[in-house]
């Protein structure tokens, strides 16, 4: 990838005064584009925590989110920064209409792994472009990778490929993509990694039809209803962490749904634990 990456203020709106955006970056493999969004703390001479995150358009601005709901991450970060005195640089990569292939680290054997290519582009090209623009380094910075749904799979895979991202936040990972490949991949995580794994218990609404009519019934999952199916899949990921002696901190919400509102509640708690 030899594309020029440039940055500008995200908006003239004062609510986004510390948010910046890149030009569109073309992914020739899938004929689609991504953008880089980054949020700077008030003092960025030293960065305590970097969070590299997927679906960046859902973090700060409701007008760009897929479903009109956002993490409202700026308020979450200010709460954490004020309480703990540790700052955060957020680098979010936007997704696109081919998210289902760009965010699937476990394609069929005869298919190109566009997700791995995307992750490598992000870490080897997108991330350095932000650091160069800000003229900062990540020396003594806690490097975190985060994502939700398919982004939850991407966060795990990112740490496998680039173990400097020792802290992983995986929210409601979409385990059924290539299942059970993610279970088998957990063993490839660094033993120094820590994964904060979350799911809600009311996430089955995303499937539309009953899961027994969608997925192979011989999967070792709970097909009694869609909510239990989702929970059982994420629980199997947690069990794979345990059986492979990888550190995992698992949490759930009884009424948690598959949306940014529930994930925002979860990530506030996770960040409080993480730092």
Question: Could you tell me what each predicted segment is?
Answer:
Residues 139-191:
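Primarily recognizes the serine-hydrolase "nucleophile elbow" in alpha/beta-hydrolase
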Residues 257-264:
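Catalytic histidine-centered segment of alpha/beta-hydrolase-like enzymes
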Residues 105-149:
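Gly/Ser-rich "nucleophile elbow"/oxyanion-hole loop immediately N-terminal to the catalytic nucleophile
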Residues 1-49, 85-88:
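A domain-start/cap signature at the N-terminus of enzymes
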Residues 266-275:
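Catalytic active-site module of serine/aspartate enzymes centered on a nucleophile-bearing elbow/loop
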Residues 46-59:
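Short beta-strand element of the alpha/beta-hydrolase
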Residues 176-255:
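The feature captures the conserved acid-bearing segment of alpha/beta-hydrolase catalytic domains
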């Amino acid at each position: 990838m030899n594309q020029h990456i440039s940055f500008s203020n995200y908006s003239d709106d004062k609510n986004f005064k510390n948010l910046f955006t890149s030009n569109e970056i073309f992914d020739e493999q899938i004929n689609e584009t991504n953008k880089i969004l980054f949020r700077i703390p008030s003092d960025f001479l030293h960065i305590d925590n970097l969070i590299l995150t997927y679906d960046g358009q859902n973090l700060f601005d409701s007008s760009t989110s897929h479903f009109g709901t956002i993490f409202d991450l700026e308020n979450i970060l200010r709460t954490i920064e004020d309480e703990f005195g540790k700052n955060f640089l957020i680098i979010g990569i936007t997704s696109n209409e081919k998210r289902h292939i760009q965010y699937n680290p476990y394609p069929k054997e005869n298919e190109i792994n566009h997700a791995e290519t995307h992750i490598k582009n992000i870490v080897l090209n997108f991330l350095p472009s932000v650091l160069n623009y800000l003229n900062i380094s990540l020396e003594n910075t806690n490097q975190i990778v985060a994502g939700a749904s398919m982004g939850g799979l991407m966060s795990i895979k990112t740490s496998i490929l680039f173990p400097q991202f020792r802290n992983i936040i995986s929210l409601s990972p979409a385990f059924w993509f290539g299942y059970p490949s993610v279970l088998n991949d957990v063993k490839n995580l660094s033993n120094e990694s820590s994964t904060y794994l979350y799911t809600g218990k009311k996430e089955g609404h995303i499937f539309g039809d009953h899961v027994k009519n969608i997925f192979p019934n011989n999967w070792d999952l709970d097909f009694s209803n869609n909510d239990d199916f989702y929970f059982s899949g994420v629980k199997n990921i947690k069990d794979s962490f345990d059986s492979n002696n990888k550190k995992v901190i698992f949490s759930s919400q009884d009424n948690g749904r598959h949306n940014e509102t529930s994930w925002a509640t979860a990530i506030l708690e996770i960040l409080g634990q993480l730092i």
